[in-house]
Amino acid sequence: MDIKDVSNESKYIDYLKQLQGAAERAARRKGQALMANSYRSQSDENTIATTLVPAPYPPCIVSANDLEAIMISDMRLETHHRGKKIMLRVLTPPDRMTAVMAIVEDEKGIAVLLQLYHQPEESIVPATEILSPNMVCILKEPFFKCATDGTYSLRVDHPGDIIWMDGADDRIPSHWRPSMVILGENSSDIRKQGKGAVQSKKWAEALRLYSSAIQAGQNVQERQLAFLNRSFVNMNMDRPKQALLDAEKATNPAMPSEKSLFRKARALYELGDYQQSLEMLEKLTQSYPENKAASSEKDRLNERLNEQRTGEYKFKQMYKQAEKTPPLIDCVTFSAPVEIRESPGRGKALFTTKAVSAGELLLCKKAFSYSFAGDEQSTKQTKILMNLATKRVVVGGQARLLTLIMQKLYHNSSLSAEFGDLHHADYQKAMVLETDGTPVVDSFLVEKIASLNGFGAPRTSRESFLQVLSSNRDMTGDEGFKYTTSGIWLLASRINHSCVGNCRPSFIGDMQIVRATKDVPAKTEIFFCYRPPVPFESYQETQKGLNHWGFTCDCGLCLRKKATSKAVFQRRKVLADDLQRLLDYPGSGNEAKSSRLMKALEKTYLTNNDCAIRLELWEPYFAFGAHLLKNNQLDIAAKMILKGLEALVHSIIACPPNDITDGPRLKVERWGVANDAVPWAFKNLANVYGQLAPELCSAAENYAEVSYTMVVGEKETWPEVLSSSS
């Protein structure tokens, strides 16, 4: 949905073909035994960070105790060794490309490359905190892979398939144990090192040190102090579930400390449990009334609870927060007007719980996961995600999103059920959520869900709207931007597609705002378009554009396209091109020609359905109306603007210019399609009425504000936009 899919761009097609060829050569070696000295070092140059999604294979759901040991010499290439496990020791410092890598050895001393995919980025967890010499692990059901460059490796796509062991684990072979012994440091000393790492904001290092301090603790008090410190670190690593668990272990039930209560409250806030967070803060302020931080936190919590209850947001504050990078907004979800219900033939969908008016807020949702790709479209160090099975290629935020979701689910398995319930086509998901005390996270399921449910998003929809304004002073274009910033919004993902929907999403940072674009009765399913309608596109081309989601659209627009012949589409294209040339160079001699061409274009549509969108007509009508307004031809300008709105299936009573009522009147009887041009159409109509019928100005301006609200998600900034555009 507005994702920048580059699968059909020539440079990526060529690159995909190269990698597919290499993958096919690797696959032909399936079942071959390992040859001696087969490892080749990787090149340091990597201007394109490409993550290849191989053919899917399920994660291991069997306990390590129930698996049989295997050695590297017994493995076969391109094979998942089901029912097997291998113990490995890290030999070398790590390297990082798209995976975190190091050379490892098995118990017989045979070495091979280990590749861990979907690990946190270097700025969050350095590779040295993921792999370092002498670390020991058990790899369950290992995948022995021949890489696209011919090298051998053990590839790990599912983070739960690997179990890391501390030095005291009696499963570690005796000849590996001496290097694992740590001497001479007590819990207090290790905590001091952890404090130094915290002061340097080296969160992953601090996490490791505080974990060691917990193990080294000689009594309950020492361990509680280390748990409390680690809770703080987990919060800063965006792992609130782990932070909460640590804060609970740091608490003395008989006399909870000030810090432990505060850490619990903060973790509950980040988990979205605002009521429990508030209750925890109440306990804190009762026991420690001098705590000022708790008081400000309570104010913040009351704001969130009010948003959740009323749907009232301070949008200007949200814009201020969206100026930061990444644009993460401190607000909460409001969804009272909608609910999830079964839709016949469409699975789970969103329905209204009450009647809503055009422009009314249906949903304001915080992202489940969000990857901001920045505002630049640089080709250096491009992150690419290539799915070899589907041949789909995405860049930027969508490529990063997979790892972000993987890590979120891995560190909070309670989220897996709701995320895994999103549409995932025919992918068979594992029914086991945890083995060996570790969450089972299927990277291929996550990739499938992210590809089918991800949204492309601007920093703010208002920013995109203003870009259209700055590039097109006639306010006619609706560019259909595609975005590299990407996110998952769980509830909004339930909204099904229609080329002509009844609601529209907009964005302020990682908040998605969905407003009704029409008056919608209670218990009615809501729809928006996953892919904006494209002028002159045939029915077959439209359905091809929707193939990715695996359905055929049967909306009214698609059915009319299906009934329209190729000759009619060609006729429309010729007329529209001729008309555009005239509108690009307006002059007194061209106005009559433009009118004739528009009438001819109108005749290519059936006239017996006033609910049928005429996709190729609204833009020339708006452009011609804006031109006539500039030339003070007010009556005709109003007619053209209204015809443009009617082409977008708005039904409007307007007098003048139509002589259909006893006195001046302007009323939208039925709202139609809400695109970026509609607010300006109503604003231009208000400008016409400023001279033609001043008493109708306020009505036209109100409709402009309502349509602006649909497009950008709020109305607070409409006066600013008006003043900047005048």
UniProtKB/Swiss-Prot annotation:
It is an enzyme of class 2 (transferase). Keywords: Methyltransferase, Repeat, S-adenosyl-L-methionine, TPR repeat, Transferase, Virulence. Residues 336-531 form the SET domain. Coiled coil: none annotated. Its EC number is 2.1.1.-. TPR repeats lie at residues 187-220, 224-257, 258-291. InterPro entries: Gramillin-biosynth_MTr, SET_dom, SET_dom_sf, TPR-like_helical_dom_sf, TPR_rpt. One of its GO terms (molecular function) is methyltransferase activity. S-adenosyl-L-methionine binds at Y530. The keyword Phosphoprotein does not apply. PROSITE patterns: SET, TPR, TPR_REGION. One of its GO terms (biological process) is methylation. It comes from the Eukaryota. Pfam families: SET, TPR_6. SUPFAM superfamilies: SET domain, TPR-like. Belongs to the class V-like SAM-binding methyltransferase superfamily. Methyltransferase; part of the gene cluster that mediates the biosynthesis of gramillins A and B, bicyclic lipopeptides that induce cell death in maize leaves but not in wheat leaves. The nonribosomal peptide synthetase GRA1 incorporates respectively a glutamic adic (Glu), a leucine (Leu), a serine (Ser), a hydroxyglutamine (HOGln), a 2-amino decanoic acid, and 2 cysteins (CysB and CysA). The biosynthesis of 2-amino decanoic acid incorporated in gramillins could be initiated by a fatty acid synthase composed of the alpha and beta subunits FGSG_00036 and FGSG_11656. This is Methyltransferase FGSG_00040. It comes from Gibberella zeae (strain ATCC MYA-4620 / CBS 123657 / FGSC 9075 / NRRL 31084 / PH-1) (Wheat head blight fungus). The lineage of its organism: Eukaryota, Fungi, Dikarya, Ascomycota, Pezizomycotina.
